[in-house]
Amino acid sequence: EEDGFLHANKTTLGADDGVGVCYMLALLDDESLKHPALECVFTVQEEVGLNGAMGLDKSILKAKKMIGLDRGKEKIITVSCSGGRRAVVEKELSYLKNESPCYQLYVGGLQGGHSGGVIHLERGNANVIMTRVYYHLSLNNIEFLLGSFKGGLKDNAIPRECVSVFASNDDFKKIKEVVLKVENDLKEELKESDEHVFVRLEKVDSLNEVISVKESQDIISMMYLMPNGFMHKSLKMDLTNISLNMGVVEMNEKFNIYFSIRSPMESAKDELSNKLSLIASMFKAKYVLDNNYPGWNYDEGSKLRKQYVDFVKETEGITLKEE
């Protein structure tokens, strides 16, 4: 506390929750206000997985209507919220000694962004692009042995960069021609969202270990089939309803692909999970659900929302924006 203000210690996370806490404490503190019975719920660890809310015993609550105050902006009301699901596809790897020249692929120049906020802008995903480059090498009968693959930092962030090293005995000029063709196609396809996208190819020192051609092709084929990005929007509101993001790819003892799946509908999250699980099983990989939290879908006939919107319009002359 400083000069009558409470400050977070070295973080701004939770500031929107803090506004909601203040609203509730002010209502509880002012005995002059007239209102129906209130049940104020305070939970912890929202930013790391809604841990407090997930552990709440809902049977202790008697109220039939709920107002969520996890919002810091004024003149805007939240009328729907995507639930989320974090998942990983894991594939065991068998390394072998490398005896071939090595090359590095680097995908960059992308804007990226939070998958919960800008996925509808359909920006390029570096992991998806890297997969596409490798798949087109296969289409042109170029054999490669994966040695490393690293893209993205967080499952819910659209990856801006991806770096991968592979070994190949095929002609470098032929490899370069394929990579350049894919890069030119991407520049045309993404000129409205990621005009600076690039795919860079260069010779590097040989790696000691790589995985086989068959295992490399299986991984790339599996990733190439996996859905990614913006899927569906609400026709009632201009909001994304279903999406998923191939946020992180890592190659170590295992090949791991981390996804963030988002939708206010559990059934939609289930469908995307089922697709990922099925594709993984086709290539002897494992689908693991890491975390799941619910959302809520838009209720077109909400009487409580209409009462609030009408009241603010009547008393403040403000037309609230719904998001």
Regions found by a protein language model. Name each.
Residues E2-E47, Y103-V107, H114-S138, A167-N169, ...:
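Alpha-helical metal-binding/catalytic segments enriched in His/Glu/Asp
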Residues H7-S94, N98, G147, S234-M237, ...:
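Acidic/histidine-rich catalytic neighborhood of metal-dependent amide-processing enzymes
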Residues V21-D29, K64, N127-Y135, K176, ...:
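Predominant activation on well-ordered alpha-helical scaffold segments within soluble catalytic domains
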Residues D57-A126, E183-K187, K191, S243, ...:
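Metal-dependent peptidase/peptidase-like ectodomains
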Residues L96-S100, I119-K150, N169-S243, L276:
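Acidic-enriched catalytic cores of C-N bond-cleaving enzymes acting on peptides and small amides
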Residues G116, K150-P159:
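A structural signal for small-residue-enriched, beta-sheet-centric alpha/beta enzyme cores
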Residues A157-C162, E253-F255:
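A short, glycine/Asx- and small/polar-enriched loop/turn
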Residues R200-N245, E250-N252, R262, E266-E271, ...:
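An extended, acidic, His-containing surface patch that forms the Zn2+-binding/catalytic region
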